Amino acid sequence: PGSLVGSEMCIRDRMKLAYADRSEYLGDPDRTVIPVEQLTSEDYLDQRRTIIRDEVAIPSAEIRPGNFEDLESTETTHYSIVDQFGNVVSNTYTINFSFGSGIVVPGTGMLLNNEMDDFAAKPGFPNGYGLVQGEANAVSAGSRPLSSMTPTLVFRDGKPWIATGSPGGSRIITAVAQTLLNIMAFDMTLGMATSAPRIHHQWMPDMAMVEPGISPDTVSILEASKHKILRSNSTIGRVNSVQIEDGWFYGYV
């Protein structure tokens, strides 16, 4: 920041995060397992860094100790791949909730899914992700439930250009859409497009979810437009993509 005041502003919320973790994880090492390796890992620090908003202080009530489980997605899995021959894969798969139905097939280690929640079990009422769905997605014999999974291949001039997708339940669609919009409409690089803060709205509930890194100005504009704001403690989706540009392969998570 170039000044003492600027430096203090830069580190204020980092101090809060450090003390939140202190309250949760530190104690007498003779009787407490202290996760030093996890607390100091690059992945964990990157995760915590997304919470920082240098322009405005984060209220302490909104800060929670970090969650190491978040380093590996507990939800849907997505991967995007391009090989040396130009073959491209965008693949998303899921068992829906964390650990699916919570039932393991004896002797196999295989978890059973709970994809039935993707149906409108009761049309007009929310499912596990808060999505309100109608009769078109009602439970019926032989039907496949509606899914938010969005594995995407983008072609330019008839050739593969981008492979992308994300986990995130109902937030997958908006996460992938915003990433592609950033590239195709706003000329962002793949890295910029992926790391740019995202918003999410799914009609019901009538709230705009915003990531921790969203600018206060953006939030103010949304609120002035009568949007109800829901601040997320984590990213909206976890987009990972591969882009082929001028003979180069670019990947970003």
Per-region residue spans from a language model:
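Single conserved hydrophobic/aromatic residue that forms the stacking wall/gate
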Residues: 1-6, 10-11
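Alpha-helical support elements that line or immediately flank enzyme active sites
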Residues: 3, 166-188
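Short, well-ordered beta-strand elements
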Residues: 3, 79-81, 88-92, 160-167, ...
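Flexible, glycine/threonine-enriched loop-and-boundary segments that flank and lead into catalytic domains
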Residues: 56-85, 93-98, 133-138
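Short Gly/Pro-enriched turn/cap motifs at secondary-structure boundaries
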Residues: 68-72, 137-145, 230-234
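Extended C-terminal subregions enriched in glycine
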Residues: 85, 143, 185-234
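Active-site rim segments in enzyme catalytic domains, especially the processed small/beta chain
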Residues: 88-156, 162, 186, 190
